[in-house]
Amino acid sequence: MTENHYLLLTPGPLTTTKTVKEVMLYDWCTWDVEYNMMVQKVRAKLVSLATKEEEKYTTVLMQGSGTFSVEAVIGSVIPKNGKLLVCTNGAYGKRIVQMAEMLHIDVVVSQTEEWEPTNIVEVEKILQQDKEITHIAVVHCETTTGIINPIVDVCKLGKQYGKVTLVDAMSSFGGIEIDIAELEIDFLISSANKCIQGVPGFGFVIAQRDELLKCKGQARSLSLDLYDQWETMENQNGKWRFTSPTHVVHAFYQALLELEKEGGVRARYNRYYNNQKLLVNRMGEIGFKPLVNEKYQSPIITSFIYPEGNFEFQQLYNELKRYGFVIYPGKISKVDTFRIGNIGDVHEEDINRLVDSIAKGVVIG
């Protein structure tokens, strides 16, 4: 197998190991007992990554991108008379709002600037004033900028006011330690192609069992029915309702084994954290400043402000691609930025090579 032609410095899809890619060379039948046993192992491993209180939680795998799993939760968990509070400071919080509106779910928004974390004082004020709210949703790592939101405080408030808590941990789960039982998270959503370092093709929901049982018959979609998907997997030993991405599941299982071999979530977090600190320090040396305040910055992806002078992102992008790197454009409207991810099979030597390449290709001032 050939090596990667580019190093993806993006928040997912990301650079995977050669061994993760190699397992996709084999074909699997969706009805095969061995394959379905692998699905069950994946489900169990995800719960064990999420909490020590494993008996309280279960995992549902859902075909499609991570957004499909988020929409499965929004469309299945909130009853017809429910009301959703969404904390948003970026594109992915806004997407949850859009889902709720499309599904005719009553929704209220707590919005902050994209470079500022969720405002806990405002969230509590909304919860105090609006007694009809039944559910609260927050994005843990908002990859629009790379900011980390205070899910501990949001979930604590949610439970203080008796709400069901939904956390989009798409770009953080597996890379930042989270105990969903301690945080009283009822539904956590993530994806195969993020910090666990698999490839795109399915998302997953780690759900509090008692809350999941309440979802029966509530779904607003056939294919995105979270309860029915879970019930089939439970009763038919890992069977999916509809065709599953067999190669992707096998790659994800391999990625889970490699996460364990690396030393678990804490070890992976340390690698990502060191990558991010090195990136910011080295970029600072050549004139680039991060958008997000250091105390709110995630170890997942960093937004850099365009420097003053004759700077063109597309030129930088093309130059870096020539050197073997792919980065992300910015995603906010008020400040010109670009983004560099440091998750995936990325190490400090890769960050150093990247910044050396940027220094060669960019003239600032």
Curated annotation (Swiss-Prot):
Q: Tell me, what is an example of a GO biological process annotation in this record?
A: organic phosphonate catabolic process
Kindly state which keywords UniProt assigns to this record, in alphabetical order.
Aminotransferase, Pyridoxal phosphate, Pyruvate, Transferase
Source domain of life: Bacteria
Q: Which cofactor does it need?
A: pyridoxal 5'-phosphate
SUPFAM superfamilies reported in the protein's UniProt record: PLP-dependent transferases
Q: Which GO terms describe its molecular function?
A: 2-aminoethylphosphonate-pyruvate transaminase activity
What is this enzyme's class at the first EC digit? transferase
Matches recorded under Pfam families = Aminotran_5
Q: Which residues carry this modification: N6-(pyridoxal phosphate)lysine?
A: K194
| Reaction it catalyzes | (2-aminoethyl)phosphonate + pyruvate = phosphonoacetaldehyde + L-alanine
Q: What is its EC number?
A: 2.6.1.37
Q: What does this protein do?
A: Involved in phosphonate degradation.
**Oligomeric state and partners?**
Homodimer.
Regarding protein family, the annotation reads: Belongs to the class-V pyridoxal-phosphate-dependent aminotransferase family. PhnW subfamily.
Protein name per the record: 2-aminoethylphosphonate--pyruvate transaminase
